Swiss-Prot record:
Methylated by PrmC. Methylation increases the termination efficiency of RF1. Belongs to the prokaryotic/mitochondrial release factor family. Keywords: Cytoplasm, Methylation, Protein biosynthesis. GO terms for cellular component: cytoplasm. SMART domains: PCRF. Residues 284-313 are annotated as: Disordered. It is found in: Cytoplasm. This is Peptide chain release factor 1. One of its GO terms (molecular function) is translation release factor activity, codon specific. Pfam families: PCRF, RF-1.
Amino acid sequence: MFLEKLSPIESKIKILEEKLQDINLVKNQKEYAKTVKEYNYLEKIKAKKDEYENILSQINENQKILSEEENLEMKELVKQELAHLNLKKDEVEHMIKILLLHQDENDSKNIIIEIRAGTGGEEAALFAHNLYEMYTKYSEKKKWKTELINFNETELGGFKEVSFEIKGKDVFKKLKHESGVHRVQRVPITESNGRLQTSAATVAVLPEVEDTDIEINEKDLRIDVYRSSGAGGQHVNTTDSAVRITHLPTGIVVQCQNERSQHKNKDQAMKILRARLYEFENLKKQEQRSNDRKQQVGSGDRSERIRTYNFPQNRVTDHRANISLYKLEEIMQGELDFLLDTLALKFQEQSLKDNSI
């Protein structure tokens, strides 16, 4: 029965209430914040559960009246009330199911986005720069803060790769479905014959990780320093300020050269490394849980083609949500809300199917 799934909630709330009264908990701010968040989440479910039970009670009362009432006009009024209550019941039940979905603990975190040019040479690098601008413009609209961490620029101003940080409310929740291969179809500025070309760039959205979230053993790291280089490969610094860190157990390599000081470059590289290792561990856990089963709307795999940007047709097609929007110019200027909200709804619907109550 639907309500049976909700029965343990009140006892969990009582346990958390007792935990919050412990003065020692306040000393551990991280654990305290986590407990408050869980308590508020369960309180939301309890409020909806109470509302649901109240509606069921009203339905039962009206059904009893209907079975006993002889006046036809009164019966019709009761039937109308029952129809309204049943609609309300379905609505509240759906809201409870959404609340019961797995809560992503990373949703409230800041993020690091990595964009890499894929197939398509210079045109792919220019598209990678376009994607960077799209996300930074969207961040401006959302009043989020962005900070460039590292980039490798081409002579025409494209990005072979770029890493940047976005800070703000629910950043990961909003942008987490952007990981994957973004494909572009357009006539490149380098193409003299005006032929349409298909290029691609890969986007990775990583939740920002604190030192306490993942443990990195210094013995597992190889750190190399070298001179920074600019577009075309020329050296832009006379000192060995650029840093490359290799995590030996996983083979993950991170490099950073955009800060003038070696120390700052190392800090930025470690920030990216923590995020990548955290993602690496999460992907392993997901594979174990799902036994390699991928959601129908997309796995979030970086190798998965998720979206096509067709410039001649002013069209953006998202292959997971199966929608095409003829507003490419607006989307490239950071008008992403409709697209992102549609995607979130698609993933939500799939989760409800996978976790049917």
